Curated annotation (Swiss-Prot):
The lineage of its organism: Bacteria, Pseudomonadati, Pseudomonadota, Gammaproteobacteria, Enterobacterales. The gene is truD. It comes from Salmonella choleraesuis (strain SC-B67). Belongs to the pseudouridine synthase TruD family. Responsible for synthesis of pseudouridine from uracil-13 in transfer RNAs. Pfam families: TruD (PF01142). This is tRNA pseudouridine synthase D. It catalyses: uridine(13) in tRNA = pseudouridine(13) in tRNA.
Length: 349
């Protein structure tokens, strides 16, 4: 398995270094649900501003305040403790009376708005996230400027970030240990983290191998293509390749890579053979996913940051603003710009 730091760069390895997240205010994330609350229903959606609190901690505190079980509070995604984040939490509170959320007091946390909603907010049920990042101590402004323009036009590899694998790769190591034993994992969080790490590592490996090809973004027979911004895909046939290539070049369609697991991967013929060969050596992780019946899926190979803009505060400090679809990693964008000083595996997704 290729180490995360050695995965193929789309625009070559950055020439300079820089510091990501010198303080929480350097990493601002605002969730974009993609819908507005219904205004009625047994659930309450709350938009919360937090700094110095992780998502699970806030959810547990909210459950205690409402005198409900912790499982009755849900969220669309984990947000980092050491960042300034706006995210939505959902609490199941049947009844017409709205709780007085002005009485909810938690250091570093503020309820910005709330409304009733008919459905539970489930993990992954958001459109995307808007990011404002500040990179400091940049050693090569010219290289970063060139890379920003290249990323705006050509995107970055849609790798799962280092944080998916845990500090020091602990989640991936846990998956490997589990795969080599028959012992059940009863801790649901560990089980989820380890399976996600296993599948993410295999995806990264497939993308890494494809990006090594000069014609990596050339549609091949059997590729699984995705409409930009959509989750479903269809299979390319040899007769359609010229037209499909035009649509890929115009970013209307995205070439996807496999999230391996049980069931069909989605690709066929030449594309399927390539993906299978790319991870042929990773039999342990593949066997784990099959054993645990993790369903195979697809994910876009490239990531195009939307609304990307930047502002140089001085020659060594730049502020970035961009929007990413749910499930994508801001750190994968930063990876294409600078060699980051320090380990950012602790940054939540």
């Amino acid at each position: 398995m290729t180490e995360f730091d050695n995965l193929t760069w789309l625009h070559g390895k950055p020439q300079g270094s820089g510091l990501l997240k010198a303080n929480p205010e350097d990493f601002v994330v605002v969730e974009d649900l993609g819908f507005t609350p219904d205004g009625e229903g047994e659930h309450i959606l709350l938009r919360i501003l937090k700094n110095g609190c992780n998502t699970r901690f806030v959810a547990d505190a909210l459950a205690k305040f409402l005198k409900i079980h912790a499982r009755e509070v849900s969220f669309a995604g984990q947000k980092d403790k050491h960042a300034v984040t706006e995210q939505w939490l959902c609490a199941r509170v049947p009844g017409k009376e709205m709780p007085d959320f002005s009485a909810f007091q938690l250091e570093g946390c503020k309820v910005l708005e709330y409304a009733r909603h008919k459905r539970k907010l489930r993990l992954g049920a958001l459109k995307g996230n808007a990011f404002t990042l500040v990179l400091r101590e940049i050693s090569d402004r010219r290289d970063v400027e060139t890379r920003l323009q290249a990323i705006r036009d050509g995107g970055v590899p849609n790798y799962f970030g280092a944080q998916r694998f845990g500090i020091g790769g602990s989640n991936l190591q846990g998956a490997l240990r589990w795969a080599q034993s028959n012992a059940p994992v009863r801790d649901r969080n560990k089980r989820s983290f380890w399976l996600s790490a296993a599948r993410s590592a295999l995806f990264n490996q497939i993308v890494h191998q494809r990006l090594k090809k000069p014609d990596f973004n050339q549609v091949v027979d059997g590729d699984a293509l995705q409409l930009a911004g959509r989750g479903s895909w269809f299979v390319a046939t040899s007769e359609e390749l010229p037209e499909l290539q035009r649509r890929v070049d115009e970013k209307e369609l995205m070439i996807t890579a496999s999230l391996p697991g049980s069931g069909e991967w989605g690709t066929q013929r030449a594309a399927l053979a390539f993906e299978q060969d790319a991870i042929a050596q990773e039999t342990v992780l593949q066997s784990l996913l099959l054993r645990e019946k993790v369903e195979a899926s697809r994910r876009a190979m490239l990531l195009y940051p939307q609304q990307l803009s930047w502002n140089w505060w001085d020659d060594v400090t730049v502020e970035l603003r961009f929007w990413l679809p749910a499930g994508s990693f801001a750190t994968s964008v930063v990876r294409g710009l600078i060699n980051t000083m320090g380990d950012y595996a602790h940054i939540a997704e």
